[in-house]
Amino acid sequence: MQLSPVTLPTTAEEAMAVQDDLRARVVAANPRPPVFATVAGVDSAYDDAAGLVATAVVVLDTATLEPIESAVAHGPVRFPYVPGLLAFRELPTTLSALEQLRTTPDLLVCDAQGLAHPRRFGLACHVGVRTGLPTIGVAKNAWGAWTEPGRRRGDAAELVLDGEVVGLALRTRDDVKPVFVSVGHHIDLPTAREQVLALTPRYRQPETTRQADRLCRAALRAATGG
């Protein structure tokens, strides 16, 4: 994939202004019939002592959930930790890993928030806007208010922030804590829900996230000699 270089803001105020500017580009609708033959998971891991971040992208065949291709990138953390500005810590290595792919995935799934974010522009939105690809955020924790969905796989409850529905608390396993699904870019919420369920046949987390998590942790260990 060919992507334009990323220039990071230098302050939290500048970063929030970037989010506010790019938010208008998010499309919360399917741009075409939502048929996804390939899906890529994106996840990052940190070594705080070394000041490093490693990101992995794993492309799966949606029919089998078997890996087709993967890529990793690591580098120094170039932006401080500020709640709501996680994207600026992970975006450089995320885009670097995506650029290495020979396969352009039909869908991206980020272990992060999308519209379920204080400024409605989490990492999944940022990556989606930068790549132009349909993107979903699937987070382990929620921004916003939600009620417990039903106990069965597939049960969902709205995730609400400032009176606006920004995502779903989605049960992917019976009697297991839900994940929090939100639109990143070029997809609607019902389709995002459907795709996340397709990616969770056995575990709470999508298979995309599980495989990317393993790979980014291995890449970080290799980078730090751990």
UniProtKB/Swiss-Prot annotation:
Q: What is its main location?
A: cytoplasm
User: What functional role does this protein have?
Assistant: DNA repair enzyme involved in the repair of deaminated bases. Selectively cleaves double-stranded DNA at the second phosphodiester bond 3' to a deoxyinosine leaving behind the intact lesion on the nicked DNA.
What InterPro entries does this protein map onto?
Endonuclease-V (IPR007581)
Q: Which cofactor does it need?
A: Mg(2+)
**What are the alphabetically sorted keywords of the record?**
Cytoplasm, DNA damage, DNA repair, Endonuclease, Hydrolase, Magnesium, Metal-binding, Nuclease
- Write the protein's name: Endonuclease V
**Site positions (Interaction with target DNA):** Y81
Q: Which family does it belong to?
A: Belongs to the endonuclease V family.
Highest taxon of source: Bacteria
| Species | Nocardia farcinica (strain IFM 10152)
E.C. number:
3.1.21.7
Citing just one GO molecular function, the answer is: magnesium ion binding
Q: Which Cys pairs are S-S linked?
A: none
Q: Name one GO biological process term.
A: DNA repair
Provide the reaction this enzyme catalyses. Endonucleolytic cleavage at apurinic or apyrimidinic sites to products with a 5'-phosphate
User: Cellular component GO terms, alphabetically?
Assistant: cytoplasm
